[in-house]
């Protein structure tokens, strides 16, 4: 959230568990690193060896300057390096191919950075660096290689939103019409998923601390509304860690309290009316959950430091599936996806449901 000390606390406290011997919906892969991984991005690319059939390319990032890439569905991972970046904490990554990706680091001031590669990670261009000590980036999302947005904690009581429309220059959005942040309110840089940009107009992000709120803009960030959710709140360690919206404007939020990661009260909430009203899940996940991804219409998967769940009813009931220590997740479709977590943990999604057909359309 608002300081490097806070980020370090989150990192240390979420390293408390290790992977079990058995996983049901997730197949553990060998990453070659033992650092804490915080973000994952996957994309289909045409395979020239298979007449252009789509194959997944997966990128992941985390602490100690670690950036990983796999072009063979996670069987092998290549470690990539940013010049002078070995001490950076890369909490966000967005990929477009085996060649092009953005990576975002967190920290106070100039430790918050955005880099881009166009040569598969051989070199990285620094596009943004925090120009004042109050800057603390939390997450990055993209609609395309040229149109992306990054969220940062409040500067002068307004959340920082950076945007690029050319894939090169990042500029802050005007904040005159944004509601002020509450004292101590911020966003969690836990899984690169507290910000959503489903199209070029709609923007949503979730917060934590004194309140677990969802800010929403329907005009590209020019004007904003804000709504309080029933997710656990009131402590600097509690609030919304992940936010997602589907094609029908149903919004799901997940969170918890990283100082009490086993707390399962008020972890998940859903809005079926585009964020206007919120309902707590009837059956909650089993503790802090930091990552969320759409499987298919009404079906979602949640990951966290103490386990994973799926829901098949828009987040009303969550069913435990695994007990891996995962931080972030991304699915490409109903059968293909990856999650990353503590101690270099990487797991591939294995859909065990017999009733979920078709292709997901994550937003």
Can you say where each PLM-predicted feature lies in the sequence?
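Bacterial N-terminal signal peptides that target proteins for export
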Residues: 1-8
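Bacterial N-terminal signal peptides
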Residues: 9-17
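Residue-level hotspots at or immediately adjacent to binding/recognition sites across diverse folds
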Residues: 22-363
């Amino acid at each position: 959230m608002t300081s490097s000390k806070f980020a370090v606390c989150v990192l240390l406290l979420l390293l408390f568990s290790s992977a079990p011997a058995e996983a049901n919906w997730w197949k553990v892969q060998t990453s070659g690193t033992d650092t804490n991984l915080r973000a994952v991005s996957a994309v289909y690319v045409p395979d020239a060896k298979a007449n252009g059939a789509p194959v997944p390319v997966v990128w992941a990032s985390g602490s100690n300057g670690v950036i990983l890439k796999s072009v063979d569905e996670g069987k092998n991972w290549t470690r990539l390096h940013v010049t002078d970046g070995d001490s950076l904490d890369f909490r966000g990554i967005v990929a477009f191919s085996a060649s092009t990706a953005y990576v975002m680091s967190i920290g106070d001031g100039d430790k918050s950075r955005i880099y881009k590669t166009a040569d598969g990670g051989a070199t990285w261009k620094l596009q943004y660096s925090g120009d004042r000590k109050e800057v603390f980036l939390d997450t990055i999302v993209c609609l395309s290689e040229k149109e992306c947005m990054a969220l940062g904690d409040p500067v002068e009581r307004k959340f920082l939103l950076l945007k690029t429309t050319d894939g090169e220059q990042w500029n802050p959005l005007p904040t005159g019409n944004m509601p002020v942040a509450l004292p101590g309110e911020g966003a969690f840089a836990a899984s690169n998923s507290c910000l959503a940009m489903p199209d070029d107009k709609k923007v949503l992000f979730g917060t934590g601390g004194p309140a677990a709120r969802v800010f929403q803009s329907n005009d590209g960030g020019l004007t904003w509304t804000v709504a309080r959710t029933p997710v656990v709140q009131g402590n600097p360690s509690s609030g919304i860690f992940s936010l997602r919206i589907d094609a029908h404007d149903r919004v799901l939020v997940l969170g918890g309290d990283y100082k009490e990661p086993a707390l399962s009260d008020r972890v998940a909430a859903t809005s079926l009316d585009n964020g206007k009203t919120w309902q707590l899940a009837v059956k909650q996940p089993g503790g802090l959950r930091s990552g969320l991804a759409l499987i298919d219409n009404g079906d979602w998967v949640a990951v966290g430091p103490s386990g994973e769940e799926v829901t098949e009813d828009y987040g009303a009931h969550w069913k435990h599936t695994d007990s891996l220590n995962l931080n972030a997740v991304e699915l490409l479709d109903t059968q293909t996806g990856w999650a990353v977590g503590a101690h270099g943990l990487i797991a591939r999604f294995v859909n065990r449901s017999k009733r979920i057909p078709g292709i997901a359309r994550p937003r």
